[in-house]
């Protein structure tokens, strides 16, 4: 599965209501669908980096791109809700910033949620009901187009030997995978006191170690 791409923007494409980029990486052109607000800062020939969610089907695969891992992971949370497919998930992220979207779901703001293409009242209600508690563990800076998503209460984790950005990404990823707050905290403390502690800036190392602890036979 493709999770991340860095390459040269070759061209912009548009088909129906969908649009995106062809990105050249090591001699291969990848067609990636993005929300239009992600496209605006990118000029032709520019080097771009996108985080990828890949959807595999019998007739091929589709790539959905995001400017950072936080938005990609939020997209994955959205499409985990029954009836929310990739196109609707992308439409939700198109309609407002990630921070505003999280706020709307937590507040049950149906008016804002239904502004997204393909989202009716029932779908908006389902989003609010199923994700309110899950997203309530995240904080988002209001009205930020570059949202900073993090778990609200992490005061007890400040002493861990991991830098703030990897810590934030680790919490978000584990939450996206369905782990509860308490499980995440226990895993991170266990990794921090283990025999082989990952480097403070090694987010992937912390993730692998946390998942090993969470999936240990006695867990």
Curated annotation (Swiss-Prot):
Which InterPro entries does the entry link to? DNA_helicase_Holl-junc_RuvA_I, Hlx-hairpin-Hlx_DNA-bd_motif, NA-bd_OB-fold, RuvA, RuvA_2-like, RuvA_C
Location of the protein in the cell:
Cytoplasm
Which segments carry the region annotation Domain II? Answer: 68-146
Q: Which branch of life, at top level?
A: Bacteria
* Alphabetic keyword roster: Cytoplasm, DNA damage, DNA recombination, DNA repair, DNA-binding
List the GO terms this entry assigns under cellular component, sorted alphabetically: cytoplasm; Holliday junction helicase complex; Holliday junction resolvase complex
List GO BP terms, alphabetically: DNA recombination; DNA repair
In this chain, the stretch annotated as Domain III covers 162-219
Please give the residue ranges the record annotates as the region Domain I: 1-67
SUPFAM superfamilies referenced in this protein's UniProt entry, alphabetically: Nucleic acid-binding proteins, RuvA domain 2-like
Which SMART domains does the UniProt record give? Answer: HhH1 (SM00278)
**Region annotation (Flexible linker) ranges:** 147-161
Question: What does the record give under GO molecular function?
Answer: ATP binding; four-way junction DNA binding; four-way junction helicase activity
Name the major location.
cytoplasm
Which residue windows are coiled coil? none
NCBIfam families reported in the protein's UniProt record: ruvA
Q: What does this protein do?
A: The RuvA-RuvB-RuvC complex processes Holliday junction (HJ) DNA during genetic recombination and DNA repair, while the RuvA-RuvB complex plays an important role in the rescue of blocked DNA replication forks via replication fork reversal (RFR). RuvA specifically binds to HJ cruciform DNA, conferring on it an open structure. The RuvB hexamer acts as an ATP-dependent pump, pulling dsDNA into and through the RuvAB complex. HJ branch migration allows RuvC to scan DNA until it finds its consensus sequence, where it cleaves and resolves the cruciform DNA.
Q: How does it associate, per the subunit comment?
A: Homotetramer. Forms an RuvA(8)-RuvB(12)-Holliday junction (HJ) complex. HJ DNA is sandwiched between 2 RuvA tetramers; dsDNA enters through RuvA and exits via RuvB. An RuvB hexamer assembles on each DNA strand where it exits the tetramer. Each RuvB hexamer is contacted by two RuvA subunits (via domain III) on 2 adjacent RuvB subunits; this complex drives branch migration. In the full resolvosome a probable DNA-RuvA(4)-RuvB(12)-RuvC(2) complex forms which resolves the HJ.
Q: What is known of its domains?
A: Has three domains with a flexible linker between the domains II and III and assumes an 'L' shape. Domain III is highly mobile and contacts RuvB.
Q: Which family does it belong to?
A: Belongs to the RuvA family.
Q: What is this protein called?
A: Holliday junction branch migration complex subunit RuvA
Q: Which organism is it from?
A: Synechococcus sp. (strain CC9311)
The organism's taxonomy opens as: Bacteria, Bacillati, Cyanobacteriota, Cyanophyceae, Synechococcales
* Gene for this chain: ruvA
């Amino acid at each position: 599965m493709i999770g991340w791409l860095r390459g040269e923007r070759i061209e912009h494409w548009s088909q129906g209501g969908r649009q995106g980029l062809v990105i050249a990486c090591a001699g291969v052109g990848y067609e990636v669908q993005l929300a239009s607000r992600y496209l605006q800062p990118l000029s032709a020939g520019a080097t771009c980096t996108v985080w990828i969610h890949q959807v595999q089907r019998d007739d091929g695969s589709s790539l959905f791109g995001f400017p950072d891992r936080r938005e990609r992971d939020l997209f994955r949370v959205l499409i985990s809700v029954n009836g929310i497919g990739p196109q609707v998930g992308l439409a939700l992220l198109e309609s407002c910033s990630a921070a505003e979207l999280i706020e709307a779901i937590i507040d049950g703001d149906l008016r804002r949620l239904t502004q997204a293409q393909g989202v009716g009242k029932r779908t908006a209600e389902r989003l609010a009901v199923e994700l309110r508690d899950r997203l309530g563990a995240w904080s988002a800076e209001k009205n930020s187009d570059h949202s900073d998503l993090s778990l609200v209460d992490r005061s007890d984790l400040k002493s861990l030997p991991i830098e703030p950005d990897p810590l934030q990404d680790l919490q978000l990823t584990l939450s996206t995978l369905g782990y509860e707050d308490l499980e995440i905290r226990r895993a991170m403390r266990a990794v921090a006191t283990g025999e082989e502690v990952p480097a403070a800036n090694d987010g992937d190392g912390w993730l692998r170690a946390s998942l090993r602890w969470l999936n240990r036979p006695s867990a």
